[in-house]
Regions:
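Compositionally biased terminal segments of proteins
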Residues: 1-273
């Protein structure tokens, strides 16, 4: 992962910590943090943006909403992206996207939760409904061992199962239809491979319990449907997207790469069965 986005993360976590908040980080960076310290055959995808997920508790408290808006646009000096006003921010090459769990009690306009008028909105993410379950707490001192300022700073990342759910929905959104985007579909599929290939038995068992708890949820049923439709064989759309990715084991021949996909497919199907 590039040092620039890790530095961006440090500043965000430090600013949140000053007001007693701990951010939840999703997306490619969240995956990188979730798997930090694990032995991986492939490195997680590089990214220059941070996906910040706000919780119901943060969104429903007016003072907290205003505090987060001040941190982003004031303390950290992010500017608003023209193509994502008030929920996509930038500072130089750094990007910050604001997401939220589905929430009642604030103004919603389409996919947009209007948290602080003309200052902070958030992209409503229905598949994040269970995002606070089984969170992983990551110490920044593990990422910045030589930085004394990192001591005591922590960040939350979703569980591998919740990361998979987010990525399955994101892939499905970008693989076909009106929002089709080949580059983003490739990125989401690659992220799914990284999560599945790097997960351990504890992750799988935790996920199995999670899926039992929420098996009747429309979100879980949809996630299982995406796995069935787009990841249930090595020739399914999702795995073909991975195979097309230039960073997917470039030194292996096609048969060896397909074998990697077959193994990952079996893991993912078993995970959501």
């Amino acid at each position: 992962m590039e040092n620039s986005v890790l530095g961006q993360l440090f500043d965000l976590v430090a600013a949140f910590d000053k007001v007693g908040l701990r951010p939840i980080i999703c997306g490619g960076l969240g995956i990188h943090l979730s798997l930090h310290g694990r032995r991986k055959e492939l490195s997680s995808r590089t990214t220059n943006d941070i996906d910040l997920m706000l919780t119901n508790q943060q969104v429903l408290d007016s003072a907290t909403r205003k505090t987060i808006a001040e941190i982003i646009t004031g303390d950290l000096d992010y500017g608003v992206c023209k193509d994502g006003r008030y929920f996509m921010f930038e500072k130089g090459q750094q990007k910050l996207d604001i997401l939220t769990q589905p929430v009642d009690g604030v103004e919603i306009d389409g996919f947009r939760a209007k948290l602080v008028k003309s200052r902070l909105h958030a992209y409503v993410t229905p598949e994040a409904v269970f995002i606070e379950e089984d969170l992983r707490k990551i110490s920044l001192s593990e990422l910045f061992p030589d930085n004394d300022g990192a001591k005591g700073l922590t960040v939350d990342v979703p569980s591998p199962t919740n990361l998979l759910i987010l990525k399955l929905f994101a892939f499905n959104d970008r693989d076909s239809g009106s929002r089709q985007d080949g580059d983003k579909a490739h990125a989401h599929a690659f992220d799914i491979y990284i999560i599945v290939a790097s997960a351990n038995l504890g992750d799988y068992r935790e996920g199995a319990e999670f899926l039992v708890r929420h098996g009747n949820s429309d979100i879980i049923q949809k996630a299982r449907s995406i796995v069935k439709d787009k990841f249930s064989s090595a020739d399914s759309a999702g795995w073909l997207r991975v195979l097309e990715t230039s960073s997917f084991f470039p030194n292996l021949n096609i048969q060896q790469r397909r074998q990697k996909l077959i193994e990952a497919k079996a893991r993912l199907v078993r995970w959501f069965s």
